[in-house]
Amino acid sequence: VAGFSLTDEKARKAQKTNSEDLKTENRGCANMELNPLRMDEYPEITSVVDKYYQSLGDKASFVEAYDNIKVYTKLGKYKDTYVAFARYEMKIKDIYTKVPGLGTVYVCKDKDGGYQVSAAVEEEDIKSYINEIAQHEDVQALIEETQTAYHEAVQSDALLQEALMDLKNAYEDSTGS
C-alpha cells in the first residue's frame, strides 16, 4: 500500500507539471470587437516596452533616442501575453527631424511574474496570430497614420532623406541584399 501511495503521489505531481505547461488561450482574442487596440492600458506592459526601446536606442550607433513612445496593445493569443504596437519618434544623430515609426513586439509574463519583450517570435501559431490581428481595422489605421507621419517627416527634411538613404545602403551592404 505504501508503494501505491508513493506512485499515486508521483502521478499527481506529473499531472500537475503537465497542466502547468499547457497554455490557456484568451477567448475571442482574434476578434477585433472583443480585443480592441488600447493605448497605454497596461502600465507594466508600457513600462517594459519603453525600456526595450530605450535599450535599442542605447545600442544603435546611429540612433540618439526613441522619443514619445506610445504603446498600443491587444491581448496575446494566450493568458498573460500581449501584442504591443509601439509608435515612436526616432531621433537620428545629427538630424533635426525625428522619424515616426511603429514596431511590433510580443510581451509575455516570465516565471518571476514580470514581463519581457520578444521582438522575434519563433512559434508559428503566435506569428500567425500576430499577422492576423495586424489586419484588424484599428491596427491598420494606426499603421496608416504612422506611414503618413513618416512620409511627411521625410518630405520635410532633405538631410533626413539623405540619412535614411545612407542607412538603407549600409544595411543592404551588410546583408548583401
Predicted regions and their residues:
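Mature, Sec-exported extracytoplasmic domains of Gram-positive
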Residues: 1-177
